[in-house]
């Protein structure tokens, strides 16, 4: 940058203003990055808690399904597969995660009333349905949280790149250029002072010889 600027007072003032703005921007970016990383960790904690809970539900669901299959005939299972067991409603909402708008898909399940189904299946089937009613919303929430983590990681990386560009490129280059312009102006001032002193000395000699 030093070779592309005019070394004068106006340039020096402009460079110093830009340097001040860059330093302030760097601090803001670092503060933002720190807060985003904390928000990411909090979100990951929520994601991990949700994942563990889903694992417990899945384990119970699989166990109940195995029990259900041992209690019912293949013909009944085939009939159940063709049935609509739930009325499903979806709702798309958004959640602000550190100024990032993250979509969340919510689901509500309403079990269909099939009176003779219990007689053909048994308690394990209905317990499995209850677990499934709880499981599906949590699965969708887990997917939404995973998407939120991805979106935040992208934003964190963008902010980190901007912060690094300022810290390791822009700010050091401005410091070097300011130093170069300041040294140039100081040298010019010293040279001018020397010339003035020489002229003054010559004038004094001329007056002394007159």
From Swiss-Prot:
It comes from the Bacteria. The keyword Ion transport applies. GO terms for molecular function: ATP binding; proton-transporting ATP synthase activity, rotational mechanism; proton-transporting ATPase activity, rotational mechanism. Keywords: ATP synthesis, Hydrogen ion transport, Ion transport, Transport. One of its GO terms (biological process) is proton motive force-driven plasma membrane ATP synthesis. Produces ATP from ADP in the presence of a proton gradient across the membrane. Belongs to the V-ATPase D subunit family. This is V-type ATP synthase subunit D. It comes from Coprothermobacter proteolyticus (strain ATCC 35245 / DSM 5265 / OCM 4 / BT). The gene is atpD.
């Amino acid at each position: 940058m030093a070779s592309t600027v005019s070394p004068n007072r106006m340039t020096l003032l402009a460079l110093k203003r830009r340097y001040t703005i860059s330093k302030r921007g760097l601090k803001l970016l670092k503060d933002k990055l720190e807060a985003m990383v904390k928000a990411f960790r909090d979100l990951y904690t929520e994601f991990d808690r949700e994942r563990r809970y889903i694992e417990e539900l899945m384990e119970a669901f699989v166990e109940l399904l195995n029990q259900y299959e041992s209690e019912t005939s293949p013909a009944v299972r085939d009939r159940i597969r063709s049935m609509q067991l739930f009325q499903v409603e979806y709702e798309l909402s958004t959640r602000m995660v550190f100024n990032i708008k993250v979509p969340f898909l919510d689901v509500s399940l309403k079990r269909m009333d099939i009176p003779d189904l219990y007689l053909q299946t048994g308690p394990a089937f209905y317990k499995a349905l209850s677990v499934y009613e709880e499981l599906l919303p949590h699965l969708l929430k887990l997917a939404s949280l995973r998407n939120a983590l991805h979106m935040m990681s992208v934003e964190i990386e963008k902010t980190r790149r901007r912060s690094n560009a300022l810290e390791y490129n822009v700010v050091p280059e401005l410091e070097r250029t300011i130093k170069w312009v300041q040294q140039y102006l100081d040298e010019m001032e010293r040279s001018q002072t020397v010339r003035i002193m020489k002229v003054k000395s010559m004038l004094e000699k001329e007056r002394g010889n007159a």
